[in-house]
């Protein structure tokens, strides 16, 4: 209510004429008008006495809008070349004018008469009156839009088509027209104007245009160029949708484009995948992936193609590796690694690191790794992988920078996850780690621990617990050695001039082959060994030391040649060499007596010393001949004639048949550029027999593991049928190895014999846990 405006008799026609004139100026934008003065006029008419003029005012407004809209229609129809521009110009003026009328000029009429009329009507029946703005829009819709819609829509379609053809157009005309339809729809609860008159036409024109263009473009430019074109078109239409379509239409437009540009050509796109892979066309693969990933199921055939191709390439690469029965671990693993890295890179670059393609890579690599012409079974790959790790982690091979080595080992861990029989890798890795730690040949402790951490992350703490205990033993051994030396000094004890150190290894933590001979320790070592034995027994009561002489090594200084040498040898080699401190020539029989080595170990140890040209082998009845030959070689070749000693060694290997006549002497003509010489030992190299024993040990460990698993499962379940038990045991074991069903059955039978489980009475395929 406005203060100071009392009810009074007024002239309706005069006031209305003023209102109409001013509203016309507002709707045509011809002159600025004071809306508040008009509000006062409307207020006067609404509170007039004796009868308010609300209804006549509403009817006059309605007629005024109708006449004005009819005039606008004529103006637009008279426009020859720029219909859409004129339409939007008139629309903006009319809409903004209606908005001002609704919110300010006729606000009192809306609140105090129109709204009451609407509320008074019976629920469900449309009202006879409308708020002023809605009234104006309804009149525009009925008296103008429907009469001119075809002409205006055609103009909009032409603009959209020109935009698609790359011509410069007034983009705002299209978006403003679309927004005008949304506003016109606001007066109708069905809101079909935008959907029927605009969206449907927009989508249909889009469908027709891209159907024609896609077919023609593929025919003229090929599928590779089409993929780029399609992606560009989709991006362009996404941008157009943001400007030219309501948000409710965006998904419809997207689905339509995907259907026309991708779905209809998906078989052709999918069929090109294999060619792109073979030719390593990474950009084309990426373009194909981007398109097909937009449609449901579009990538399924591509996933299958990629998996088969990786497997094909991998299997072919493995076939090219020489010596399938005894392949080089380095060649084998680096071949696998090359395949993995090659396709991992492709998946990262061309498939956006899509998890589905990563899974496909995993499946393909798993098959390549475990089922190729070299493995034939699943145990060969983990063995070769462990041996390759040993090559990387051991001194003496091609040295890598620490960062490079960590990267390499990280890649090995990735390959490791594809190993089915991780217990095989564990067994071989444990053996080789044992050797590296005992012989001090690890590249570094940090790198060793880096690898163990990677294995622990892959398989858990239990898998690497033995590895960690080995390191603990090495650390404790260093402390024990220091304490032993302090003990000797403190108690004024002497072990001679020998620099003695020892490794105390926990039984069960180390994968070591047992000693097969009762080696007789050289007299020179007995004092230090007995001193340490006594010291250790006082420090650790109840513990027993078992000496592993076949793993011991020593450094011996020699004086038999023209200059002295420091030989790095095994204890077995040392035991033989020390005999020559008291004898110039020693028979095979005497060496056997002094060392107590069995025939195999003695033969291999002697052979290593002969091949190193430290010892010379000869027969007693040929002493003079051999001596003459040696003298001639020394005189003629100035020490370079040592090659003849190799021939002698090759022809005179120790054997039981020649034990009565075979003799050995040190090679006084020995010569080497280095003063420190490491004498290789075949005893420290794994033999086929030892390899076979390793697999036997793995087999036994598996049986024990399966039995323990069966007992744990049955203890928890109490009763299970045969099939369910087999399935659960396989699932329980699969992270360590892939058990075969016959082995599981055998373990079940053994547990029945041991009375851990029993068969249910009357049900041969059901088992009961025996508490």
Curated annotation (Swiss-Prot):
Q: Where is this region: Disordered?
A: 622-667
Could you tell me at which residue positions the Glycyl lysine isopeptide (Lys-Gly) (interchain with G-Cter in NEDD8) crosslink is annotated in this chain?
715
Q: Which residues form the signal peptide?
A: none
Q: Which PROSITE patterns match?
A: CULLIN_1 (PS01256), CULLIN_2 (PS50069)
GO terms, biological process: negative regulation of sorocarp stalk cell differentiation; protein ubiquitination; ubiquitin-dependent protein catabolic process
> SUPFAM superfamilies under this entry?
Cullin homology domain, Cullin repeat-like, Winged helix' DNA-binding domain
Q: What does this protein do?
A: Probable core component of cullin-based SCF-like E3 ubiquitin-protein ligase complexes which mediate the ubiquitination and subsequent proteasomal degradation of target proteins. The E3 ubiquitin-protein ligase activity of the complex is dependent on the neddylation of the cullin subunit. Appears to ensure that the proper number of prestalk cells differentiate at the appropriate time in development. May govern prestalk cell differentiation.
| Name of protein | Cullin-2
Q: Which organism is it from?
A: Dictyostelium discoideum (Social amoeba)
What gene is this protein translated from? culB
């Amino acid at each position: 209510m406005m203060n100071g405006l009392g009810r009074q008799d007024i002239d309706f026609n005069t006031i209305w004429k003023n209102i109409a004139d001013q509203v016309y100026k507002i709707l045509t934008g011809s002159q600025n008008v004071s809306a508040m003065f008009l509000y006062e006029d409307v207020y006067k008419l609404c509170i007039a006495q004796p009868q308010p003029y609300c209804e006549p005012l509403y009817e006059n407004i309605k007629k005024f809008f109708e006449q004005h809209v009819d005039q606008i229609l004529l103006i637009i129809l008279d426009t020859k070349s720029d219909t859409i521009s004129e339409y939007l110009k008139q629309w903006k003026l009319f809409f903004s004018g209606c908005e001002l009328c609704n919110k300010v000029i006729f606000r009192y009429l809306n609140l105090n008469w129109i709204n009451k009329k609407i509320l008074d009507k019976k629920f469900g029946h449309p009202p006879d009156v409308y708020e002023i703005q809605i009234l104006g829009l309804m009149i525009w819709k009925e008296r103008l839009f429907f009469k001119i819609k075809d002409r205006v829509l055609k103009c909009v379609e032409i603009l959209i088509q020109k935009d698609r053809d790359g011509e410069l157009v007034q983009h705002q005309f299209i978006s403003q027209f679309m927004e005008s339809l949304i506003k016109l729809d606001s007066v109708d609860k069905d809101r079909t104007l935008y959907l029927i008159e605009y969206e449907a036409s927009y989508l249909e024109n889009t469908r027709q245009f891209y159907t024609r263009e896609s077919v023609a473009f593929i025919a003229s430019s090929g599928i590779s160029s089409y993929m780029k074109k399609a992606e560009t078109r989709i991006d362009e239409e996404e941008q157009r949708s943001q400007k030219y379509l309501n948000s409710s239409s965006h998904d419809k437009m997207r689905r339509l484009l995907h259907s026309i540009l991708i779905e209809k050509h998906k078989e052709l796109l999918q069929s090109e995948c294999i060619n792109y892979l073979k030719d390593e066309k990474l950009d084309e693969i990426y373009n194909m992936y981007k398109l097909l990933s937009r449609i449901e199921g579009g990538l399924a055939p591509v996933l299958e193609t990629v998996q088969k191709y990786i497997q094909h390439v991998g299997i072919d690469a493995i076939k090219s590796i020489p010596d399938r029965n005894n392949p080089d671990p380095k060649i084998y693993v680096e071949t696998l690694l090359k395949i993995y890295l090659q396709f991992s890179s492709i998946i990262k670059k061309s498939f956006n690191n899509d998890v589905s393609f990563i899974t496909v890579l995993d499946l393909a690599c798993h098959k390549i790794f475990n089922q190729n012409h070299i493995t034939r079974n699943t145990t060969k790959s983990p063995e070769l992988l462990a041996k390759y790790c040993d090559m990387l982690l051991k001194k003496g091979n091609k040295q890598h920078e620490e960062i490079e080595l960590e990267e390499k080992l990280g890649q090995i861990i990735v390959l490791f996850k594809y190993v089915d029989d991780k217990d095989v890798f564990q067994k071989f890795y444990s053996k080789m780690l044992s050797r590296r730690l005992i012989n001090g040949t690890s590249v570094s402790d940090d790198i060793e621990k880096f690898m163990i951490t990677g294995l622990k992350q892959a398989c858990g703490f239990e898998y690497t617990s033995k590895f960690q205990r080995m390191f603990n033993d090495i650390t404790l051994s260093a402390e024990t050695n220091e304490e032993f030396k302090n003990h000797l000094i403190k108690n004024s004890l002497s072990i001679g001039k020998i620099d003695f150190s020892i490794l105390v290894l926990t039984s069960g933590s180390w994968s070591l082959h047992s000693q097969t001979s009762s080696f007789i320790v050289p007299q020179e070592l007995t004092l230090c060994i007995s001193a340490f034995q006594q010291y250790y027994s006082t420090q650790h009561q109840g513990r027993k030391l078992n000496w592993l002489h076949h793993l011991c090594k020593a450094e011996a200084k020699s004086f038999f040649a023209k200059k002295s040498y420091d030989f790095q040898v095994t204890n077995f080699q040392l035991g033989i060499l020390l005999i020559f401190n008291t004898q110039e020539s020693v028979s095979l029989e005497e060496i056997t007596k002094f060392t107590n080595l069995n025939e195999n170990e003695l033969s291999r140890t002697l052979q290593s010393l002969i091949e190193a040209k430290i010892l010379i082998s000869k027969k007693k009845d040929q002493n003079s001949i051999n001596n003459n030959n040696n003298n001639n070689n020394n005189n003629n070749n100035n020490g370079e004639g040592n090659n003849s000693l190799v021939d002698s060694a090759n022809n005179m290997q120790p054997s039981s048949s020649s034990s009565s006549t075979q003799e050995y002497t040190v090679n006084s003509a020995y010569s080497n550029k280095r003063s420190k010489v490491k004498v290789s030992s075949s005893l420290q190299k794994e033999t086929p027999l030892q390899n076979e024993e390793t697999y036997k040990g793995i087999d036994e460990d598996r049986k024990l593991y399966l039995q323990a698993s069966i007992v744990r499962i049955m203890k928890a379940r109490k009763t299970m049928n045969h099939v369910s038990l087999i399935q659960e045991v396989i699932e329980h074991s699969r992270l360590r190895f892939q058990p075969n069903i016959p082995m599981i059955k055998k373990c079940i039978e053994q547990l029945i014999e041991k009375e851990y489980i029993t068969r249910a009475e009357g049900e041969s395929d059901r088992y009961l846990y025996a508490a």
